[in-house]
């Protein structure tokens, strides 16, 4: 099974878990932002959490611009994980605790993600640490779930530090160990100066970056 197949399967299991437990689709706060994955009866402009479901992209999105900017070859799993689907944030339970996976809400969201990953890669280069890119958060102390770009292994990582605990040999293997967490949607408060808030977890990633850089 590929990373994309494992992610698609988790989306399907995630949706089924909400339908079985709550009788409805997963919901998230949209911050007024439209998305192809919003359900037909959703109201993008509402302040209330709205129902969503995974939708395949018509064209695959890639990270060639980030690779070019950093002059590195990014591990192919990054395109599989981020480039094929639109979806809301995925809350999970795992052998290592609760967490949340980043997913792409709309096209603008993908651009924001590229900027965040580029900033993360630049930080790793500046600190002379192994290159990683993130796919989510885990635990209650804002640790990242990151992928080692050299070999595709999955790790826990604190911003500004080297990864400290390997979670899986691959992103595919990591995804296969997750279980959907059926829980109320989380409202992620963005700093006041931020434009285009993300319905998922970029607020937490931004906070980690600000704590590291003092900005």
Swiss-Prot record:
Q: What gene does this protein come from?
A: syd
Q: Organism's domain of life?
A: Bacteria
Primary localization: membrane
What family is this protein classified in? Belongs to the Syd family.
Disulfide bonds listed in the record: none
Extract the CDD domains matched here. Syd
Keyword check for Acyltransferase: no
Q: State the organism named in the record.
A: Shewanella amazonensis (strain ATCC BAA-1098 / SB2B)
The protein's role, per its UniProt record: Interacts with the SecY protein in vivo. May bind preferentially to an uncomplexed state of SecY, thus functioning either as a chelating agent for excess SecY in the cell or as a regulatory factor that negatively controls the translocase function.
- What InterPro entries does UniProt report for this protein, alphabetically? Syd (IPR009948), Syd_sf (IPR038228)
Q: Which membrane topology term applies here?
A: Peripheral membrane protein
Any GO CC annotation of this UniProt entry: cytoplasmic side of plasma membrane
Give the protein's recorded name: Protein Syd
Keyword field: Cell inner membrane, Cell membrane, Membrane
Query: Where does it live in the cell?
Result: Cell inner membrane
């Amino acid at each position: 099974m590929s990373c994309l197949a494992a992610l698609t399967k988790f989306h399907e299991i995630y949706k089924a878990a909400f339908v079985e437990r709550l009788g409805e689709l997963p919901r998230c706060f949209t911050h007024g932002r439209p998305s192809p994955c919003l359900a037909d009866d959703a109201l993008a402009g509402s302040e209330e959490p709205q129902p969503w479901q995974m939708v395949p992209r018509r064209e695959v999105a890639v990270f060639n611009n980030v690779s070019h900017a950093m002059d590195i070859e990014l591990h192919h799993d990054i395109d599989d994980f981020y480039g094929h689907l639109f979806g809301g944030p995925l809350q999970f339970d795992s052998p290592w605790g609760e967490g949340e996976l980043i997913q792409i809400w709309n096209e603008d969201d993908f651009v924001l993600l590229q900027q965040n990953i580029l900033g993360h890669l630049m930080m790793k280069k500046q600190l002379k640490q192994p290159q990683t890119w993130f796919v989510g958060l885990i635990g209650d102390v804002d640790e990242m779930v990151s992928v080692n770009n050299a070999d595709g292994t999955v790790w826990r990582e604190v911003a500004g530090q080297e990864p400290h605990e390997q979670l899986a040999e691959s992103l595919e293997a990591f995804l296969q160990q997750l279980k959907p967490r059926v829980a109320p949607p989380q409202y992620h408060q963005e700093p006041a100066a931020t434009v285009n808030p993300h319905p998922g977890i970029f607020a937490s990633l931004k906070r980690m970056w600000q704590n590291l850089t003092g900005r």
